[in-house]
Amino acid sequence: MDIFPAPAKLNLFLHVIGRREDGYHLLQTVFRFIDHSDRLHFDITHDGVIRHENLIPGLTETDDLCVRAAKLLRQRFGRESLGVKIHLEKNIPLGGGLGGGSSDAATTLIALNRLWGINWKRERLMALGLELGADVPVFIYGRNAFAEGVGEELHAVDLPSAWYVVLTPPVQISTAAVFTSKELTRNTIPIKMAAFSMGQGHNDLEPVAMRMQPVIAGWLGWLKQQHGTTKVAMSGSGSCMFAEFPSESAAREVFGRLPGDMSGFVVSGLARHPLSDF
């Protein structure tokens, strides 16, 4: 395999149920992978150099999650001669709450684990991923999941097939700014997966994000006015949002009514991560 996909995710709900002494928030969420991916290519070298060939403008290699993931894996494996040239085709919106950076890091760990001949088990890679970010482990886990803790306690869930209209407002939201906001609800009562299956659940981050970027409220309001959707919510800390539909035709009908000043895409939900068996 020359090209490795890094799929986006949706948070079908996201509750903040507490806060640890170290400042990390305790969450409940359902992660769903969708068929919209970044694509990564890895050119293996043996000169000890790890380089991202096409860094996102404004991002340094010190901050780049792909480079950080590669360096962390090599450091723990203990072979400094391992090198790689990374090329990223970026399709997932930045700062949108779709997990693009975390997914890129996870795909880097999954791919280099094989390409470098390390062959560690997924559980070990998930522990490395958690050092890079709370959302990284689920992409290595490879299954849609009910998540608890800071997002690392994962329980596989089988979700019904669904299609989504995902809207992409022209704004970015800082995850850190949302989670440090004094207005964030941090004491939502925990629920069971069965309650989510019966339609319970919301996104506690939505009100904060809407105050930071009022355009989010307007776009969410438009989605909620459309007929045929089974769920409308912001994903993660935003700014992207989604409406869920039981069929592609229903999703495309609503997307066809999208006002000219709004943008997005139609996509299907995935049953598994495309690299779950790699």
UniProtKB/Swiss-Prot annotation:
The active site is at residues 9, 135. Keywords: ATP-binding, Isoprene biosynthesis, Kinase, Nucleotide-binding, Transferase. ATP binds at residues 93-103. Its EC number is 2.7.1.148. GO terms for biological process: isopentenyl diphosphate biosynthetic process, methylerythritol 4-phosphate pathway; terpenoid biosynthetic process. It holds the Pfam family GHMP_kinases_C. SUPFAM superfamilies: GHMP Kinase, C-terminal domain, Ribosomal protein S5 domain 2-like. Signal peptide: none annotated. Pathway: Isoprenoid biosynthesis; isopentenyl diphosphate biosynthesis via DXP pathway; isopentenyl diphosphate from 1-deoxy-D-xylulose 5-phosphate: step 3/6. Gene3D superfamilies: 3.30.230.10, GHMP kinase, C-terminal domain. PANTHER family: 4-DIPHOSPHOCYTIDYL-2-C-METHYL-D-ERYTHRITOL KINASE, CHLOROPLASTIC. Belongs to the GHMP kinase family. IspE subfamily. This is 4-diphosphocytidyl-2-C-methyl-D-erythritol kinase.
